[in-house]
Amino acid sequence: MIETTPLVHAEPAPWPHPRRAWANAKFFESMDWYSHRRLGARKRALFADLPRVVVELGAGAGASMRYLAPGSKLIAVEPNPHTHDALRRNAERYGIDLEIREEPAESTGLAGASVDAVICTLVLCTVGDPTAALAEVHRILRPGGRFVFIEHVGSGPGPVRAVQRLLRRPWRYLFDGCCLDRDTSSSIAAAGFADVRIEPFRFGGAFVPVWPQISGVAVA
């Protein structure tokens, strides 16, 4: 099932600020336990049979590493340098062979048709151009390769949508361009994948603006 919400087009992120980038890196590192509590079972199921070489868009502080098989190689596409020390610590902790790339999700620098799996968690909300990021995923995947994702999305009509609209601008400023109301389901469905499976679910917890979420797999 693919939920439909008003499509929000790409728009430039707020003017970057090093202190905000640092604060975001520290915030998400400190929230690793909460992410594990809320998304751990879903990530474990989605990542269970990934190949030994995986690209992750927006790897952040490495919250997904614990769900990869020890000995896996992770190519972490993460342009925020303030997360890189945490990435290295988590790679050592979970036995992951880590390669960090500072390129943006829209232009990873990886060769076309070179990988079998790309993952991302709560990333397409923040990239400057989600259409370009999805095109890049499709470009670097080999035929039959998988794009595995978990994303928060715009809500359908109701109180949560009202909260998203109310907080949209301050949220976007505080969280490095994160858009609360993107129609990511439609963007993935339109990205040219051979097969797309999307499951809407409710995140729950204290962060009401990101309650509506999706997870799934798209096959190149």
Please report, for each region that a protein language model flagged, where it lies by residue.
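A short glycine-rich, Lys/Arg-flanked "PGG" loop and its adjoining helix->strand segment in the class I
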Residues: 131-143
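Short alpha-helix
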Residues: 176-192
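Class I SAM-dependent methyltransferase SAM/SAH-binding core
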Residues: 55-56, 60-107
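A short acidic, Gly/Pro-enriched loop at the edge of an enzyme's catalytic core
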Residues: 106-118
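Conserved beta-strand signature within the Rossmann-like core of class I S-adenosyl-L-methionine
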Residues: 144-152
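Core SAM-dependent methyltransferase catalytic element
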Residues: 197-220
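Conserved alpha-helix/loop element of class I SAM-dependent methyltransferases that forms part
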Residues: 33-53, 63-67
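A short SAM/SAH-binding and catalytic strip from SAM-dependent methyltransferases
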Residues: 116-129
